[in-house]
Amino acid sequence: MNLMLTLLTNTLLASLLVLIAFWLPQLNIYAEKTSPYECGFDPMGSARLPFSMKFFLVAITFLLFDLEIALLLPLPWASQTTNLNTMLIMALILISLLAISLAYEWTQKGLEWTE
């Protein structure tokens, strides 16, 4: 019951904060707020340059693989359990998923930097 009350309170509080932020008007909109800031100096060039999509895709791929590898970190502690077969099967499934997704990225040329 305590857990349900805590979850309900957190959900209601988060929803209330989102609604307040959504319905409050934007105040003090003027040109200085939308201009780029470079340590107090006038900008040397345009700060609205297009972003490299290849860099973005490689960065997202790196984050996904990094998160999947982070799932492998508890394996030394999991190897001390009595149910070792389940742990090994899950680890092999995760490593296979990593290998298959790496092969897919490679074949789709998602890891190539040059166009």
Swiss-Prot record:
The keyword Transcription regulation does not apply. The keyword Membrane applies. GO terms for molecular function: NADH dehydrogenase (ubiquinone) activity. It is found in: Mitochondrion inner membrane. It catalyses: a ubiquinone + NADH + 5 H(+)(in) = a ubiquinol + NAD(+) + 4 H(+)(out). InterPro entries: NADH_UbQ/plastoQ_OxRdtase_su3, NDAH_ubi_oxred_su3_sf. GO terms for biological process: mitochondrial electron transport, NADH to ubiquinone. Keywords: Electron transport, Membrane, Mitochondrion, Mitochondrion inner membrane, NAD, Respiratory chain, Translocase, Transmembrane, Transmembrane helix, Transport, Ubiquinone. GO terms for cellular component: mitochondrial inner membrane; NADH dehydrogenase complex. It is a multi-pass membrane protein. Its main location: mitochondrion. Its EC number is 7.1.1.2. The chain crosses the membrane at residues 3-23, 55-75, 84-104. It is an enzyme of class 7 (translocase). PANTHER family: NADH-UBIQUINONE OXIDOREDUCTASE CHAIN 3. Core subunit of respiratory chain NADH dehydrogenase (Complex I) which is composed of 45 different subunits. Interacts with TMEM186. Interacts with TMEM242. Belongs to the complex I subunit 3 family. Core subunit of the mitochondrial membrane respiratory chain NADH dehydrogenase (Complex I) which catalyzes electron transfer from NADH through the respiratory chain, using ubiquinone as an electron acceptor. Essential for the catalytic activity of complex I. This is NADH-ubiquinone oxidoreductase chain 3. It comes from Equus asinus. The lineage of its organism: Eukaryota, Metazoa, Chordata, Craniata, Vertebrata.
